[in-house]
């Protein structure tokens, strides 16, 4: 770039000298040509070389050829009958073209630097502990199972498990979330997070290339390969358009003079118009700015933890009118908690005490919820003869009494009559019943908790024009009904098996509005068939999950459903910017093309319509990078 700046400055000085010589000395035409040809050759040798190279490779029709023909033609016009020398304009056009190229490359480089800074999540070194010593090395050299030390202020270089220490992590580079995440012994951590406070020893679980930060960066880099329809069309259009423009310019130069009184007298006039036509016809503003718009949009989204795998998926997301949610892990936290305790003859703590002790060895999510809720007071109970009844519950002997914990079917099986509870009529949870020696003593309500921003997420989707929201769940109808009504979801389908969810998505695909798309939102782990079948698959909570990143077209790195509306808004804004560039570039070019055909537009106006429009379009494209 520095070389080009020096060439532009030197050419400007030589052009000024050439103009002063031309103005003050009445030189013969060929001497004037030499005076102007020196700065022309200095500023255009690379463009001329690219044009020749394109011809040799069988791909001649690009902006280099158009500029070469136009500027060389400007030098030739002066030697035609009644032709006015256009040496100054020939050099000026190429000079301005190179200035435009300089601005374009500068804007593109700044954009790429901005995206690189936004996605600066991969550290360059790792502190490996070997034989009691700390060795600083490249993260790519660290093997699975080795121990690394991460000091406060450092980025975690590799995924792994904390084996010593506790701290708070800044995950903003991965998720866009500014609130620190507390971690301690036994927690899994991912690369790219910044260690804020404590000293951490981490046992590496993934190689550098397979760690989260590397996968995310690879995903962003590969996104440019998945072209949108607009990008693909523009590239095909340029290949067809440029040869047509060259043919049209040839016709414009040589056919109209036949209708003049003197062909030779009119040729120079129409040749000038044709050369102006060639300059303004260059499609570089479209070819450069539209892909750059998508590139910036994808980079900006990545900064706040929304990974869109390409311009084609961005276009599909922008046209979404139907959003289908899996319930667990998407609208709800996917973590069961004790919501209520309804004893018949014991205290709440005593009932919970019995249930937690019976379930103490179970790995079922409900058992874990009971144990988490129970505050052990140090009471020692003798728990014996634990028996599990598949799909029903568990029984055990506690201090000589038979305690059964399970569902309604289990109570019927042991002959315990359930006492109706008016408090549970509108509960969204699952009732865990408890009986002692065959007598019903109460129940505990376990519920999956709705995410704090789920309600606002649905409301925001409706605000941006989503016409239908649907929830699919394997849970009971009563639970699904409560959640759907609370969140304002339009339709819900409950008690579904995985295959049923695919069938429902198939049906909804046939019902969606014409030219719109259907997006399915899931956790990306158990929903792979549905994610694949939807027009656009969105995986939530994918931080540290390779399966989620692989399965979806759009990946939300945290658990916030509110980012679904944000991802759609970013996609729509990006496409709007790309369309603005297309309309602006085509509009200006068409206007100047018409003016050049009728002889009003000069080469200077043509250069602005080409290079000036390109620079403005590139600057406009960079707006897609700024995501609020």
What positions do the PLM features span?
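N-terminal membrane topogenic signal
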Residues: 1-10, 241
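Short, hydrophobic transmembrane alpha-helix segments
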Residues: 18-32
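Conserved ATP-binding TGD loop and adjacent catalytic N/P-domain core of P-type ATPases
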Residues: 400, 430, 436-580, 588
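Actuator/coupling domain of P-type ATPases
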Residues: 19-22, 36-125, 129, 141-148, ...
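P-type ATPase nucleotide-binding
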Residues: 151, 338, 342-468, 477, ...
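Conserved catalytic phosphorylation-site environment of P-type ATPases
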Residues: 63-68, 174, 272, 282-358, ...
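Bilayer-spanning, highly hydrophobic alpha-helical transmembrane segments
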Residues: 12-13, 232-261, 273-294, 579-608
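Juxtamembrane helix-loop transition segments at the membrane interface in multi-pass membrane proteins
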Residues: 52-61, 103-117, 292-311, 622-628
